[in-house]
Amino acid sequence: LPYRERKVKILNGLHTMSVLAGYNAGFKIVRDMINDKAFKAYIDKGLNEEIIKTIDLDENELKAFANSVIERFNNPFIDHKLLDISLNSVAKFKARCLCSLLDYYNKFGKIPSVLSFSFAALINFYENFENKDYPVNDVESVLHFFKTKHNDIVFDVLANVGFWGEDLTKIDGLYKKVKAYFDDIKSLGISKAMEKLLDE
């Protein structure tokens, strides 16, 4: 059902791809995030160069739909709080973003950058959450996993079959890319790491 796929990958996927990075970059609501130049470029790149390329519908129609979604994000009368949208983000990432990431890999034989960065941003948001100044709301099994000590959190998240239904470390190049972005986020902060991604 391509139209359902369009909604999940573009409308829902866009939220999940951006909100955790957005919150950790200091934004509180979707509209402020989407009006930031770097985030807008990040979202456009993820949409046009990655997500849309995996959906079997007319590209112009998909871009029109994507633009209508971004306009909705920009609605001055609705304050979509990023933390509200962050609820259960692990399951949401699987349903909304991982499908695009894997479809892209299967179609083009390479790992998509923005979707991998958003994966790294997800891990950064959850990692060591008990010592952070924001609430992380997810199911107990997810919270328990992130409370546990990990020598390599990126590897362990990707290898968690319970989260993803498969061991993602077996996808050639995915671990290396997500780990590189995660390390950039840790050393540079989200905004600078994102600028580096956009310069690739």
How should each PLM-predicted stretch be described?
Residues 1-200:
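Non-transmembrane, aqueous-exposed alpha-helical and coiled segments at domain scale
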